[in-house]
């Protein structure tokens, strides 16, 4: 397995959905950063299950700091964080151990390893992303110390979608964080879709934006900013697509329609538009970073689907009623996308400081 992400500022996540705990080890964090268990509460709450229109699994997701912090200051040594699994219910998975669950990683894991822990998805479960969000809290603290702000929000839910990238502001952050869906979309329309389709699930899109980034983040040629972001976002469970700036729509434009014109004023050189998404040649250029991540519908639904037992016998598979699943994983993925954005930017920020004497 490849459980590490990052170069200078790196994380290693561990644990399974129905194990006693999950966690993450962060290496490369500078010393002297203020950090306490309370710092993790807001971000963990945004990803936590058991809330409106998310999985009913009740996990407090309290973060315990095991190492790397003394007197609420990081020491520069590896930081180890632990999150206990408090609400594990494996009984519904016992009856599923002899069949393949459509859309789940079980078939792939068993084919690769010959054996797999399939309780709640095991290592492939989105439960693993709680560790990423915890690590992202530390990354965000570093970014804020450098006056870099980031935000992710739900920009698509089923057929509802907005492709606009708003300008990042304190009021926008507040609006997203106080929305039950972390979105700028009409909440009533999302609720109606959920009420009209109680046995089905929905896909979604999560957008991310930043304040203007410093020029120079990104390491050509294989460590380009968009390339690393694509890898980070596509590593999130259920992620199915990634774009930066105009993305796929740029393939339908002419060059004259796509190009961002350079302009200059008393503050310096900038772009008149931002269809490039904030990077040229894979390097940040002083513009806001803008991108989107597409998520598939949740695979666990109450409607029947054809499958087979492990001996090849055809069956009509239906998710057990006692199973606990999200109607749309993109809602809780908002916090995960923001965390992976923060982790990527901090790593590139530290790498960039090595490029010039």
UniProtKB/Swiss-Prot annotation:
Q: What is this protein called?
A: Chorismate synthase
The record lists the catalysed reaction(s) as:
5-O-(1-carboxyvinyl)-3-phosphoshikimate = chorismate + phosphate
Q: What class of enzyme is it?
A: lyase
User: What EC number(s) has UniProt assigned to this enzyme?
Assistant: 4.2.3.5
Q: How does it assemble?
A: Homotetramer.
- Source organism per entry reads Chlamydia trachomatis serovar A (strain ATCC VR-571B / DSM 19440 / HAR-13)
State the Gene Ontology BP annotations. Answer: amino acid biosynthetic process; aromatic amino acid family biosynthetic process; chorismate biosynthetic process
Q: How is the cofactor bound?
A: Reduced FMN (FMNH(2)).
The entry marks the following residues as binding NADP(+), namely 47
> Which family does this protein fall into?
Belongs to the chorismate synthase family.
Superkingdom classification of source = Bacteria
């Amino acid at each position: 397995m490849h459980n590490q992400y990052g170069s200078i500022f790196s994380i290693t996540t561990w644990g399974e959905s129905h194990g006693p705990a999950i966690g993450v080890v962060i290496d490369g964090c500078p010393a002297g950063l203020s950090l306490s268990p309370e710092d993790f509460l807001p971000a963990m709450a945004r990803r936590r299950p058991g809330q409106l229109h998310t999985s009913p699994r009740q996990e407090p997701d309290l973060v315990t700091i095991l190492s790397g912090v003394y007197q609420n200051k990081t020491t520069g040594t590896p930081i180890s964080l632990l999150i206990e699994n408090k609400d594990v219910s494996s009984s519904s998975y016992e009856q599923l151990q002899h069949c393949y669950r459509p859309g789940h990683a079980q078939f792939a894991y068993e084919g690769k390893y010959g054996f797999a822990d399939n309780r709640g998805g095991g290592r492939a479960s989105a439960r693993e992303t709680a560790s990423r969000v915890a690590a992202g809290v530390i990354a965000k603290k570093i970014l804020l110390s450098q006056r870099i702000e980031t935000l992710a929000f739900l920009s698509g839910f089923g057929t509802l979608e907005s492709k606009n990238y708003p300008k990042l502001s304190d009021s926008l952050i507040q609006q997203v964080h106080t929305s039950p869906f972390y979105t700028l979309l009409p909440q009533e329309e999302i609720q109606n879709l959920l009420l009209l389709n109680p046995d089905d699930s929905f896909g979604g899109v999560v957008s991310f934006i930043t304040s203007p980034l410093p020029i120079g983040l990104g390491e050509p040629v294989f460590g380009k900013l968009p390339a690393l972001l694509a890898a980070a976002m596509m590593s999130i469970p259920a992620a199915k697509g990634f774009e930066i700036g105009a993305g796929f729509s740029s393939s339908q434009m002419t060059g004259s329609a796509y190009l961002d014109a350079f302009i200059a004023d008393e503050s310096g050189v900038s772009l008149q538009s931002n269809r490039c998404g904030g990077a040229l040649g894979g390097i940040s250029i002083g513009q806001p970073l803008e991108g989107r991540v597409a998520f598939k519908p949740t695979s666990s639904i109450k409607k029947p689907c054809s499958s087979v037992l492990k001996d090849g016998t055809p069956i009509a598979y239906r998710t057990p009623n006692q199973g606990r699943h999200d109607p749309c994983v993109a809602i809780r993925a908002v916090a995960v996308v923001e965390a992976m954005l923060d982790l990527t930017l901090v790593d590139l920020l530290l790498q960039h400081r090595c490029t010039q004497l």
